[in-house]
UniProtKB/Swiss-Prot annotation:
Subcellular location: Virion; Host cytoplasm, Host cytoskeleton
Keyword entries, A-Z: Host cytoplasm, Host cytoskeleton, Virion
One GO term describing the cellular component: host cytoskeleton
Domain of life assignment: Viruses
Free-text function comment from the UniProt entry: Minor inner capsid component. Displays NTPase and RNA 5'-triphosphatase (RTPase) activities. May function as a cofactor of polymerase VP1. Associates with microtubules and plays a role in the formation, structural organization and morphology of viral inclusions, where the assembly of cores and the replication of viral RNA occur.
Protein name: Microtubule-associated protein VP10
TM helices/strands, residue ranges: none
UniProt keyword Glycosyltransferase present: no
Subunit and interaction comment: Interacts with VP1.
Length: 605
């Protein structure tokens, strides 16, 4: 029997393979062995029946029926029928070479949760008791074929549920054939509607032909659950197949050790790297002294990117390289590389890609458990991030996911509008702010930015040099006095209108009307994501899912290059104040990894 494909698709099913041959969609379609053909034939029968029987919620019902073991409800008209049904089902099970204990008859109360491996849970009920989750079949209906199907695929890694898992499916564009498509075959459109990838767009037909519909030698294994891979549960000595090599970043120490052993067991041709290290040089002479000193001893820089966004070796313009590859970077290896990718993106510096190599050892401090939590889309998210750390980019992705977004700078901007009116002025200030245009909002300075700018002038008159002149190399008494003065102002200000009180009032006003910082109205999904600058603001919201965003680039250099705010000097000092204030606290997640994971999630919608 052939192995599990990298992605499920309609060409594994009899109807899909018939269409492929009829319309010459695919060449050299591998003929399935009889055992596979029989399995996919029975899977197709149930999928087609489900789609036709439960038009609106067939996926949910199928999930209940199959995801945690087999569960089926059979309804009967009289109690005498019940006894006969039990006997017929038991006889059917035994006739298929299974033990009678394979089937367990249960009550409605126990018709929930997980089922033991290699067991079928059957709920026998009289008709008219109302709906339950999952599948319901009448006794006079075709229940025997359904139970037979359950017995046939019991214990198999290929189930009907696998065909509707969004992360495991790959669509094929059937629209060019829709006019001539037989009505009885249009259920395939419903089947692949939620799949996140598409042949010819995000996955090539060549890869599909090789791995999906499908090659005998191919099973792509990984040491943990991962899209497009099958988790390897066997012994080290028994490993045969291709290994998806994941970076240490996303693995526990135990998983990483097991992967290393599998890599030594597998042949090099069996490696399937999912992430790569791209090394490049910059084709420019650096004149800025701070940047020049930081990069003086480093000539080659690097970043990590997924296999779907790999550059070829060669020269690229800074603009093209930034858009196509740096925007997809999931991490960097060192501080000089953070500087380099910030320079390339901000100054459009041309680059020369020297090498692209698969990577397994990359780790930047991200705790991947927090990524998994965020991907579950909790109702309340609070993310701590530096100034210039890429929060705006994240906020747009969360908006696409249906979140109501509160930007980190909004708190300070609204406090500027509140002025000296305190809590009494908050409602009026919020009503005004959520109805401002994006340009009008940009023109409103943050109260914290205004105060830092004022203090920079005060301490500048005492001899404090501008930030860009040696501040990163040395800090003296005036720097500490500057931050101490700002700390006093900051502590006093956040106690007048606390961050948590502000957040509650902001979302309440947004629900009444107006727009958030991404120009969107209030989302009815009632999910919120709040970006903050500091730990004190974060502690005001301990109750949601909390994380700190670690930037992939140099935030100081990004602020210097973009030149936003009242002054670059004040922005840079604010940046350092927040960094010093935060230190260690929340679980950390790399900006690149989180953006990468959320974009993968968006593909599934």
């Amino acid at each position: 029997m052939l192995k599990r494909p990298a992605y499920y698709n309609i060409f594994l099913l009899p109807t899909g393979r018939r269409l492929a041959k009829t319309y010459n969609i695919l060449e050299n379609l591998i003929t399935l062995p009889k055992t596979d053909w029989k399995l996919y034939e029975t899977i197709e029968q149930k999928l087609k029946w489900m789609i036709q029987e439960y038009r609106s919620d067939w996926r949910d019902r199928l999930s209940h029926h199959e995801r945690y073991g087999m569960k089926v409800r059979l309804t009967y008209r009289s109690e005498s029928e019940r006894t006969k049904l039990e006997e017929k089902i038991t006889d059917l099970v035994i006739s298929h070479g299974k033990k009678a204990s394979t089937v367990h008859f249960c009550t409605r109360e126990s018709y929930k949760g997980r089922v033991r491996a290699n067991q079928i849970l059957i709920l026998l009920e009289p008709e008219g008791l109302g709906e339950v989750e999952g599948l319901t079949v009448r006794a006079e209906g075709n229940w025997m074929s359904l139970v037979t199907h359950c017995l046939f695929i019991l214990g198999s890694t290929l189930t009907c549920f696998g065909f509707v898992d969004p992360a495991r499916g790959c669509r094929f564009n059937l629209l060019p054939y829709i006019k001539t498509l037989h009505p009885n075959d249009k259920w395939l459109l419903d089947l692949q509607a939620s799949w996140r990838l598409e042949y010819g767009v995000s996955r090539s037909i060549e890869e599909g032909a090789l791995y999906d519909f499908f090659a005998e030698s191919h099973t792509l294994y990984a040491v943990r659950t991962w899209p497009g891979c099958e988790k390897y549960l066997g012994a080290l000595e028994a490993f045969v197949g291709r290994l998806a090599v994941l970076p240490a970043q996303v693995l526990t120490s135990k998983e990483h050790d097991f992967q290393s052993k599998l890599m030594s067991k597998a042949k090099k041709t069996g490696f399937h790297y999912l992430y790569y290290l791209v090394s490049f040089t910059m084709k420019t002479s650096l004149t800025d002294r701070i940047v020049k000193e930081a990069l003086a001893t480093v000539k080659v820089f690097s970043f990590v990117v997924g296999r779907d966004h790999l550059p070829a070796v060669g020269v690229y313009s800074g603009e093209d390289f930034s858009k196509q590859f740096l925007s997809m970077a999931v991490g960097t290896m060192d501080t000089p590389s953070r500087y380099a990718i910030t320079i390339v993106s901000g100054m459009q510096v041309d680059v020369d890609v020297k090498s692209v190599t698969g990577i397994a050892s990359f780790k930047d401090g991200t705790q991947h458990t927090i990524v998994d939590e965020i991907l579950l889309q909790p109702a309340r998210l609070v993310l701590l991030g530096r100034k210039g750390g890429g929060k705006s980019r994240l906020s747009k992705i969360f908006s696409e996911l249906g979140y109501n977004v509160l930007d980190s700078d909004t708190y300070g901007k609204v406090l500027t509008l509140v002025a000296d009116r305190g809590e009494d002025g908050l409602d009026d200030a919020l009503k005004k702010f959520v109805r401002l245009t994006p340009d009008e909002r940009k023109a409103v300075p943050s109260i914290f930015e205004t105060e830092m700018d004022r203090l920079c002038e005060v301490f500048g008159s005492r001899g404090l040099r501008p930030y860009a002149q040696r501040c990163q190399q040395q800090a003296g008494r005036l720097h500490w006095e500057l931050y101490a003065a700002f700390q006093e102002f900051y502590d006093r200000t956040i106690r007048v209108i606390t961050p948590d009180k502000f957040r509650f009032a902001y979302f309440a006003e947004l629900e009444r009307g107006g727009f958030d910082d991404n120009g969107l109205t209030f989302s009815p999904e009632l999910k919120t994501v709040v970006f903050v600058h500091s730990m004190p603001e974060l502690f005001e919201a301990m109750g949601g899912c909390v994380a700190e965003i670690v930037p992939t680039h140099s935030t100081r250099l990004a602020i210097l290059l973009r030149g936003q705010g009242l002054s670059v000097n004040a922005e840079l000092h604010l940046h350092d104040f927040y960094v010093a204030l935060n230190q260690n606290g929340a679980r950390k997640v790399s900006l690149g990894w989180l953006v990468h994971a959320l974009n993968e999630l968006l593909k599934m919608r």
